[in-house]
Regions:
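Extreme N-terminal leader/targeting segments of oxidoreductases
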Residues: 1-17, 35
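Conserved N-terminal/central alpha/beta ligand/cofactor-binding core
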Residues: 4, 45-211
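N-terminal Rossmann-like FAD-binding beta1-loop-alpha1 element of flavoenzymes
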Residues: 17-42
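Generic signal for short, ordered secondary-structure residues
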Residues: 12, 32, 92-93
Length: 211
């Protein structure tokens, strides 16, 4: 009976895909649907969009990605798989061989797809794999971050984003390790000076730079 009532219902809108949640994966899914000529609807229970992605550090670990290759860093599926298997020894349902292969094979394709539709990435050079001494580890890293962006350009959407509360510094995640050594290294001191200059310019120009 419920099925009969549902089929007779007149709807105001019709969509090919209904996506629950508004995090990074949901946004990618909606973009993929749009690229296929389909209509997608993202539904979010909270007042702000972004989900837990908005509270994350914003670092993507994508081995063998095109951005690192453009930076002159070579990688391969085989090397990345060797590293992943050496550090992630648990092989339960959430970390099966099939999931590992899918993640490593399709990750670079996802980056290419997002770049094609306007997403900007920056190679976090020096953000090494956590266990880069393990087989297949990459000392220069396989991580991607977003370049700094003035979120004032988003207009009213600026206040609709879920973001980690507190002070937001105009710097990328890959710069924090260097900044933390400001009292011990010249590179850290230089990073601190750059940050101060960037904060001053942002203040004078009214920009709100975020990663």
């Amino acid at each position: 009976m419920r099925a009969d009532m549902s089929s007779a219902q007149d709807w105001d809108e019709s969509f090919d895909f209904v996506i629950v949640g508004s995090g990074g994966a949901s946004m990618c899914a909606a973009l993929a649907a749009k690229a296929l000529g389909k209509r997608a609807l993202i539904i979010e229970k909270l007042a702000k969009v972004g989900g837990s992605t908005g509270y994350s550090g914003g670092v993507w670990w994508i081995p063998d990605n095109p951005v690192m290759k453009r930076a002159g860093v070579e990688d391969s599926y085989e090397r990345a798989r060797q590293y992943l298997d050496s550090v992630a020894t648990y092989h339960g349902p959430g970390s099966s061989d099939a999931r590992r292969e899918t993640y490593l094979r399709t990750g670079p394709k996802m980056v290419e797809f997002l770049e094609r539709y306007g997403m900007a990435f920056q190679y976090a050079d020096g953000w090494s794999d956590y266990y880069d001494e393990k087989p297949g580890g990459q000392p220069r890293g396989r991580s991607l971050v977003a370049p700094l962006f003035d979120i004032n350009e988003l207009g009213e959407w600026k206040n609709r984003l879920s973001m980690y509360p507190g002070v937001h510094l105009p710097m990328g995640s890959q710069d924090f390790p260097t900044l933390f050594l400001a009292k011990r290294t010249w590179a850290g001191k230089l990073m601190a000076l750059r940050l101060a200059g960037r904060m001053l310019r942002a203040k004078l120009t009214g920009k709100d730079l975020r990663e």
